[in-house]
Amino acid sequence: MKFHIGKDGEVKIILVYKNAEKVEEANDLYSYLKEKELFKGDLGEVYSHISHSEDKFILLGIGEKEKTTANSLRKAFFNAGKELMKFKVTSIKISIPMFKNLKYESIVQSITEGLLQSEYSFEKYLTKKKISPSIKNVYLDILEEKKEETINTINESKNLIEGIFLARNLVNEPAIYMTPTVLANNAKNQLESLGVEVKIYGKEKIKELGMEAFLAVSKGSFEESQLIVMNYKGNSNSDKKLALVGKGLTYDSGGYSIKPTSSMINMHSDMAGSASVIGAMKAIAMSKLEVNVVAIVAACENMISGGAYKPGDIISSMSGKTIEILNTDAEGRLTLADALWYAVDVVKADKIIDIATLTGACVTALGSINTGAITNNSYLMDNVKKASECAGEPVWEFPNNDEYKELIKGTFGDLKNSSGREAGAITAGMFLQEFVGNTPWVHLDVAGTAYLSSKNGYLQKGATGVPVKTLYYLAKGFKNK
């Protein structure tokens, strides 16, 4: 899909508010449809006037006027893209509208992203493919003085989509093919050509670093664990670094605290945190952001074998802190503990964001709408929230009262890796906080938002790419301060 500035295009998209009095460009048809209750202008509603007409257009509902947001525009244009594919439309034209509550840049970005998101599908293993993308050219009728801004916004949106689609593809890949080594090679292949330095460390180096918690989780698998370190240097005049740490469980059986079959089926998605940081790094590098970002992924599988770690074990970590294993299915926090300490002790990051499909408790609390968050720094949290709002990927902050720390204190080790059912999403985050020292840090629990069991707006079933956009906008605003 290519975007152009101009008024060409085979089919025009006409925007309609819910229950609008009239539609200038198609009022007779709209009045008829409204009277017959065939089209009301609900958000994402589409009426096609394409098949038997020289004046080809679609009516696209954008909902109630006062409720128009960047995200609602994404949803509407996603639906428009899907509808146009059914008719194999190859080119479209859109007059960029103005909304009092939205910046022009945000409007263009939302329209662009909505259309691009409509092209995504994961059909690699289907012998019969579904409807293929057909829109080759999109013509945008814009204000002349906004031309440069529009072109820049389109390019940035396309870079973001590249990162999002990469993340989605990595997560949707079944675990039989997406092993830790394959994940590492994907990071290398996708990022090195963009100027990102990618280093991959195997078991011996991981052991040398003292990452015993990470290694403990991987002991039950035949697949070798991989530490993936991606370094993007966008500002040579600064030594400030933002670290993105992604959970990289390419498959999680639960270990000896084994999951039921129904809970295992989608556990190839337990590396969504790692996929999001790889995707974000791609978008950051493609856009040449003037910022220094280091992404870290501790990739492994959590499996069962004679050598696997067990409930009741006490293990050490790169930080030196010891951990009692009460539940082998609380493994992500163990791999992250060492990856976070690597960000602190080796990378010496100035700010850290970790992203993980960490707890079912977060899904219970927030469902698939909001990403859960916990922090040790309110200023950084505010920046994450602003980035998430810009991205249309809402974040909800959990409390971090010191009293919760009592729930993760160990009896025979410094910490325990599970606090039971009580405040599970919070205590998991508090556990991670033990491995960041005084470095400003935010934990994002994407257990409910990174992978969907059913369609939600412009996000289809399966991997969503959340929170690639949030990480990108956070990095964009970081500016090495």
Curated annotation (Swiss-Prot):
Q: Give the reactions, separated by semicolons, that this protein catalyses.
A: Release of an N-terminal amino acid, Xaa-|-Yaa-, in which Xaa is preferably Leu, but may be other amino acids including Pro although not Arg or Lys, and Yaa may be Pro. Amino acid amides and methyl esters are also readily hydrolyzed, but rates on arylamides are exceedingly low; Release of an N-terminal amino acid, preferentially leucine, but not glutamic or aspartic acids
- Enzyme class, one word? hydrolase
Q: Which InterPro entries match?
A: Leucine_aapep/pepB, Macro_dom-like, Peptidase_M17_C, Peptidase_M17_leu_NH2_pept, Peptidase_M17_N
The coenzyme or cofactor needed here is: Mn(2+)
Would I find Metal-binding among this entry's keywords? Answer: yes
Catalytic residues (positions) = K259, R333
**Positions with a binding annotation for Mn(2+) 2:** K247, D252, D270, E331
Residues that bind Mn(2+) 1, according to the entry? D252, D329, E331
> Cofactor stoichiometry and binding?
Binds 2 manganese ions per subunit.
> Its domain of life?
Bacteria
**Single GO molecular-function term?**
metalloaminopeptidase activity
Question: What start-end ranges are recorded for coiled-coil regions in this protein?
Answer: none
Indicate where this protein is primarily found.
Answer: cytoplasm
GO annotation, biological process: proteolysis
What keywords appear on the UniProt entry?
Answer: Aminopeptidase, Cytoplasm, Hydrolase, Manganese, Metal-binding, Protease
Q: Can you say where in the cell this protein is located?
A: Cytoplasm
EC? 3.4.11.1, 3.4.11.10
Q: Name one Pfam family in it.
A: Peptidase_M17_N
GO annotation, cellular component aspect:
cytoplasm
Xref: HAMAP family: Cytosol_peptidase_M17
Q: What does this protein do?
A: Presumably involved in the processing and regular turnover of intracellular proteins. Catalyzes the removal of unsubstituted N-terminal amino acids from various peptides.
Q: Which family does it belong to?
A: Belongs to the peptidase M17 family.
- Protein name, UniProt field: Probable cytosol aminopeptidase
| Species name | Clostridium tetani (strain Massachusetts / E88)
